[in-house]
Amino acid sequence: MMEEIDRFQVPTAHSEMQPLDPTAASISDGDCDAREEKQRELARKGSLKNGSMGSPVNQQPKKNNVMARTRLVVPNKGYSSLDQSPDEKPLVALDTDSDDDFDMSRYSSSGYSSAEQINQDLNIQLLKDGYRLDEIPDDEDLDLIPPSQVSPCSLIYFQEGVWKT
């Protein structure tokens, strides 16, 4: 009868020593050493074929593996230089000839600081537009919606397990 194996149970030393493959039990220690030596020889022959000597970890990279600096430059085929010549026009032209948009003469020294003058102008503009948000205090009563009138015939309530009107 097979025993159930607990996967959290630590195996005993005896079960660890048993080989999993039954054919592996027939290999002696001398055979293992011979196989290891054969693998080492094959690795040495392969490294000699590739031109590397010794351990691959200790090898320095070859100088011919580095790409030449001239090959790293990417040419600008079909692109003009970013510098603008005098005959070229800029991408965006700003017209500053018209002073109609913003009059700076109003903000000159007229007794008010520029911040006060801008604040007055903003208040005037808000009054012209019909917004008096800065002058009207926030009233919480304005935010509430009054309840609708309830007619006495539509009043139904639940009392002591019975619906009543």
Swiss-Prot record:
N-acetylmethionine: residues bearing it: M1
Database matches in InterPro entries: FAM219
Compositional bias annotation for Polar residues: 49-63
Biased composition (Basic and acidic residues): 32-44
Residue stretches of biased makeup (Low complexity): 105-114
Keywords from the UniProt entry: Acetylation, Phosphoprotein
Transmembrane feature ranges: none
Phosphoserine: modified positions: S55, S85, S98, S105
Residue(s) carrying Phosphothreonine: T96
Pfam families: FAM219A (PF15260)
Region (Disordered): 1-114
UniProt similarity note: Belongs to the FAM219 family.
Protein name (database record): Protein FAM219A
Organism: Macaca fascicularis (Crab-eating macaque)
